[in-house]
Amino acid sequence: MLDIKLIRKAPEECETRLRKKDPSISLLPILNLDKEVRQLKTDSESLQSQKKLLSRQIHQTKARNEDASDMIGEVERISQELTRLEALLEEKDAALQNLLVRLPNYPDEDVPISPDKTGNRVIKSVGSPSTFSFPPKHHLELNQKLQILDFKLPGKTSGSGWPAYKNRGVLLEWALLTYLLQKQQSHGFQLWLPPLLVKREILFGSGQIPKFDGQYYRVEDGDQSLYLIPTAEVVLNGFHSQEIFNEKDLPIYYAACTPCFRREAGAAGAHERGLVRVHQFHKVEMFAFTTPEQADQAYEKMLSIVEEILTELKLPYRLSLLSTGDMSFTASKTIDAEVWLPGQKSYYEVSSISQCTDFQSRRSETRYKDSQGKMHFVHTLNGSGLATPRLFVAILENNQQEDGSVIIPEVLRPYLGNQEVLSAQE
């Protein structure tokens, strides 16, 4: 959520910055409503003062045994007008807040301006796309012999886009997750297995709604709706909603391992079959609460961890600075880490690392008190560390052998009984 004071102070500058993300944005309706709200507050405060003054005069008049009926009538008239003004103020302020919460975060100055992902800028490449002495197979073809994934049986129970891991696939997935969690812990992150269902206001706090209302799985619990999390970012941000940190306790680093649930997976094309785009997947999420001054260092820390993981897994990858048209609603800056998938003949995102400035903390009311006792909103950052489906695919497709077997990355072998190869099964 953006600071209305800044919009009020520099409306043209704010609108210019916001239009880099969405050219249709106009701040005029917000400015007009803000003006009405402030005038209504002024009028209401003026009437409250008049009412208090008249009440004192009535008390004094009655103490002198004089007639106060005219003043009493005026107080009643003012009370009625106050009731009307307060109802109108509530209505106008709700309309103002409804517009404010739909504004995205401002993009940083160094973010490329583009309406879509075609404007993303590759800022680093490590390794070259894998080459083979044989025609490489898609992970679905590899699975025909490996037998580590199943799409048919879960399709019966849940529909398309809900894969199941089985046998050695389960062990490889958990080896990957254990490795990722231990990596986060080694860098000072507190580990969490948080709830998977959250209240609506927690989704609001992280910026998922109202902008993207209807895109999340929801369950009804009596008179309350709970939502399946699309990312652990939601719940980690919500842990400290309406709380105040001491500056000396920042930064705080969290990492959570959760299933994530997303409805939009059904839009995948034929080339994105299998694990590339699904409704449910595991992800280790990094999250940080910082002061504004600590945010850049936290960002570099998250990015370096992602690079360390991809380097240890020996996967070809690149980093892309997302354009204004491809970055998220909440982010001021996002770098995607993308791995090469031979089966898709393309790079695919496995991690997004985002700075969100004070956008989420204003919505969640998460603040900190500095050494002078002054209150500030914290800055929040998040990053995938990492999402496993495409990482799983990358491991299979980049390490495949001609016979359909797969070489297990060295860093994962200790979690798999030092097994070196996933052998193909005839």
Curated annotation (Swiss-Prot):
Amino-acid positions noted as binding ATP in the UniProt annotation, renumbered to this chain: 262-264, 278, 349-352
Gene Ontology CC entries for this record: cytoplasm
Top-level division of the source organism's lineage: Bacteria
Key words of the record: Aminoacyl-tRNA synthetase, ATP-binding, Cytoplasm, Ligase, Nucleotide-binding, Protein biosynthesis
Pathway: Aminoacyl-tRNA biosynthesis; selenocysteinyl-tRNA(Sec) biosynthesis; L-seryl-tRNA(Sec) from L-serine and tRNA(Sec): step 1/1
Positions in coiled-coil regions: none
GO biological process annotation, one example: seryl-tRNA aminoacylation
Keyword presence, DNA damage: no
Compartments (UniProt record): Cytoplasm
A Pfam family: Seryl_tRNA_N
EC number: 6.1.1.11
Catalytic activity: tRNA(Ser) + L-serine + ATP = L-seryl-tRNA(Ser) + AMP + diphosphate + H(+); tRNA(Sec) + L-serine + ATP = L-seryl-tRNA(Sec) + AMP + diphosphate + H(+)
Keyword Flavoprotein: no
InterPro entries found in the cross-reference section: aa-tRNA-synt_IIb, aa-tRNA-synth_II, aa-tRNA-synth_II/BPL/LPL, Ser-tRNA-ligase_type_1, Ser-tRNA-synth_1_N, SerRS_1_N_sf, SerRS_core, tRNA-bd_arm
Binding site for L-serine: 231-233, 285, 384
Family membership: Belongs to the class-II aminoacyl-tRNA synthetase family. Type-1 seryl-tRNA synthetase subfamily.
The protein's name in its UniProt record: Serine--tRNA ligase
Gene name linked to the record: serS
